[in-house]
Amino acid sequence: METMRDIKRRINSIKNTQKITKAMKMVAAAKLKKAQLKAENARPFFEKTRSILIDVARRTRQKDIHPLLREKENNRSLFVMITADRGLCGAYNARVIDRVKKLTEKEDEVNFLAVGRKGRDFFGKRGYNIISEYINIDDYPDYSLAGKIGEEIISLFLDDVVDRVVLVYTYFNSAISQEVRDLTLLPLTPPDDKNQEEGKINTEYLYEPSPEAVMDILLPSYIKNILYSALIEAKASEFGARMTAMDAATDNAGELIDKLTLSYNRARQAAITKEITEIVGGAEALK
């Protein structure tokens, strides 16, 4: 049975931990606000690029296929996975890793481009080929990082090092809801024209010097836009997951402190009762 001193030591230790988790929750909440704003501001730009790609792809569909759209015969896959550099964010990293494990089960040859330390460490320690890694990512990634990653995977695809590129990341819905998503980056499949299916009128654009020339610039840009969107969505999701996890940890610490305080008070009451009983017993013996 624990002594009063042991219980008191545990209470103080948990209180110190609670201070840390509460501080981490507040920091994550502050970072989340800015990251969420960046993610929401980037979505309209991404959607506009997407709509232009739909229109250009529709005009060039009957012509020579672009190298970034061409499917290959082999099955050498590159998985671009975005995880966090640190833990203490609930199941955020585990969900991404689980999705990647499921996607790679039936792959012939698997390679990784790891964004974030946690994903790199998990698959690197298990003998997988990490072609490239990006760690110590800023809290608010800029477009240059997406551009660098985009150039690398486009080069790997065009040089026939890999035949398919799959992106796995976490989409931010809210502070308590994040969704792991995966999509094939290369060969790139132009998104469907949903407006056309619904009978809506599309704006006609004139592309100079030609739709094909625009496609040469637009496709790499579209890939980089997807990556940038994924990076900032993932960061917002990480902060949301960490804030939620630290909030739960703070609450759990409070509950444990209450239980231990109750145990301490009971032990103290028992000790006082025992001491009083001994005093009364001694007094009776002296009579």
From Swiss-Prot:
Record organism: Halothermothrix orenii (strain H 168 / OCM 544 / DSM 9562)
Transmembrane feature ranges: none
Pfam family, one: ATP-synt
Family: Belongs to the ATPase gamma chain family.
GO biological process, one term: proton motive force-driven plasma membrane ATP synthesis
Keyword Secreted: no
Keyword Chaperone (UniProt): no
Keywords: ATP synthesis, Cell membrane, CF(1), Hydrogen ion transport, Ion transport, Membrane, Transport
Protein name: ATP synthase gamma chain
Assembly, per entry: F-type ATPases have 2 components, CF(1) - the catalytic core - and CF(0) - the membrane proton channel. CF(1) has five subunits: alpha(3), beta(3), gamma(1), delta(1), epsilon(1). CF(0) has three main subunits: a, b and c.
Membrane protein topology class: Peripheral membrane protein
GO molecular function, one term: ATP binding
Protein role: Produces ATP from ADP in the presence of a proton gradient across the membrane. The gamma chain is believed to be important in regulating ATPase activity and the flow of protons through the CF(0) complex.
GO cellular component, one term: proton-transporting ATP synthase complex
Subcellular compartments: Cell membrane
